[in-house]
Design a protein with these regions (language model features):
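Long, low-complexity or tandemly repetitive, helically biased scaffold regions used
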Residues: 259-261
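A conserved structural/catalytic subdomain of Rossmann-like adenosyl-cofactor enzymes
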Residues: 4-5, 9-257
């Protein structure tokens, strides 16, 4: 089912309905979707996956996935999931259900698509180098080509770069998946996915089915910059700019005085 964000967290009748659904054990997966996924609606929504045939060992749990920040931009008003992104989202569900064989088959599919058996991070790094080298080659070739041939030369390299970037995108999706789940072990990922029990949902979260209430936020990556040291550097730069500004104002004022203004 596709539902609004309101119906998965509102109280009143909506809450009563959610409680009854949760108590059945048939709520399988809840997924948040970002903006601009539908032509007629730009607002975010939620996907409800209900399953009366859930295995016994999963009846007491629900998988929450927050995919609001995971998508491909088509244009200013349209987002979508690429085929590989859809496969990755499916892979999270497979691992939650213990279907590791499907996950491993996806890794094999990635390697086949990339025609490379190295670790995905190595493949990504190599492709990034290839893209950069191709850009530099293209720039030099276009500059060296006769004026009448420059457009054709640029188009030739654009096609080659497009093919390389497509492979790089696939490699990045493979890295995105394997950095989180390795060779096929499900784990809760802050900001992305979380398995919660019916007791937690009903008694601690007020029957909310909002994935964001469970998955939390992704940790902020450390960029390796010493904040205090950087602030001192910025302060010093500001003082130098202020001093330079004062000197310029003095020069301008002096010149105006000499002109009798």
């Amino acid at each position: 089912l596709v539902g609004s964000e309101m119906c998965i967290r509102d109280r009143g009748k909506d809450k009563d309905i959610r409680e009854k659904l949760i108590q059945t054990g048939h709520v399988d997966v809840m997924m948040s979707v970002g903006n601009n996924f539908f032509y007629t609606k730009s607002l975010p929504c939620s996907l409800w996956f209900l399953d009366k045939g859930k295995p016994e060992h999963l009846l007491d749990t629900v998988l929450f996935i927050d995919a609001r920040n995971y998508y491909t931009v088509v244009d200013r008003t349209q987002n979508e999931w690429s085929d590989w992104q859809l496969k990755n989202l499916n892979a999270i569900v497979w691992l939650y259900r213990g279907e590791v064989d499907k996950y491993k088959a996806l890794l094999t599919e990635y390697h086949a698509e990339l025609a490379d058996d190295r670790p995905f991070a190595e493949i990504q790094a190599a492709l990034e180098q290839n893209v950069q080298a191709k850009r530099e080659e293209a720039k030099a070739a276009v500059e060296a080509a006769p004026r009448k041939e420059r457009k054709a030369t640029q188009e030739k390299f654009d096609k080659e770069l497009e093919a390389l970037n497509e492979k790089l995108t696939v490699a990045k999706e493979a890295v995105w998946l394997t950095e989180k789940f390795g060779e096929g072990v499900y784990q809760d990922i802050p900001g992305l996915c979380k398995v919660a029990s019916r007791d937690t949902i009903l008694n601690e979260k007020g029957a909310s089915l909002t994935p964001g209430a469970y998955v939390g936020v992704a940790p902020v990556e450390d960029d390796g910059v010493d904040f205090a040291q950087r602030m001192k550097e910025i302060h010093k730069e500001l003082l130098e700019l202020q001093a330079e500004s004062n000197r310029l104002m003095e020069t301008i004022s002096k010149n105006l005085e000499e002109m009798g203004v």
